[in-house]
Amino acid sequence: MIIDLNADLGEGGENDEALLKLVTSANIACGFHAGDAQTMRQSVRWGIGYGVALGAHPSFPDRENFGRKAMNVPAEIVFAQMVYQLGALSAIVAAEGGTLSHVKPHGMLYNQAACEPALADAIAKAVKVVNPALRLVGLAGSELIRAGQRLGLETRQEVFADRCYLPDGTLVPRTQAGALINSDELALAQTLEMIQRQRVRAIDGSWVTVQADTVCIHGDGQHALLFARKLRSCFSEHQITVAAA
């Protein structure tokens, strides 16, 4: 059994380099919610040095709210914003001698694309135009995954170790109580359930079927490092190989 472990980096966190020793894929902020040309370049250099898969982490243009504010942006504008961000990171990766492997939207762009077909299509079309070899990472079972599949893109279905799920398979919004799992033990148990049994318990007690290609851990805070180490130990104990998807 193989699983990819990814983290969102280049967002101003202090633990980026240390996390790169534990994850197999890195999603690098492209400047719209966090980061700039220099942080993108540094993240790429670190990622190449540690041999992780390099991915773009594009967002709505929302630095004030860290990309976590819902926005009503026309599909054609989202398409242009995606091409802009992917183009910038692709150029930096090429300049450093690396290869961009995947794209994972950030924050509300990710969450809205999970439910909104037109937005999902705009993102998938931008990825295909920039580089049809790029893999599109999205919430397991989401509209974004379906949009990528319709266009013939390789997709990677993502699950979250420390987030709670609604009965429809989407994430409990961060604005609601109970959105996050604060117990490492519960987060580890949920992760194993998703990988080994392809299901997750929703907040109403029902089971939701999920495909787990890659697991996200959040890179902010010292706790992220401790949890990443626990996750790697848990995978080793259960004979789960960690490798880039």
From Swiss-Prot:
Its EC number is 3.5.2.9. One of its GO terms (molecular function) is ATP binding. GO terms for biological process: carbohydrate metabolic process. Keywords: ATP-binding, Hydrolase, Nucleotide-binding. InterPro entries: Glyco_hydro/deAcase_b/a-brl, LamB/YcsF/PxpA-like. It catalyses: 5-oxo-L-proline + ATP + 2 H2O = L-glutamate + ADP + phosphate + H(+). It comes from the Bacteria. The keyword Transport does not apply. Forms a complex composed of PxpA, PxpB and PxpC. PANTHER family: 5-OXOPROLINASE SUBUNIT A (PTHR30292:SF0), UNCHARACTERIZED PROTEIN YBGL-RELATED (PTHR30292). Catalyzes the cleavage of 5-oxoproline to form L-glutamate coupled to the hydrolysis of ATP to ADP and inorganic phosphate. HAMAP family: PxpA (MF_00691). Belongs to the LamB/PxpA family. This is 5-oxoprolinase subunit A. It comes from Pectobacterium carotovorum subsp. carotovorum (strain PC1). The lineage of its organism: Bacteria, Pseudomonadati, Pseudomonadota, Gammaproteobacteria, Enterobacterales. The gene is pxpA.
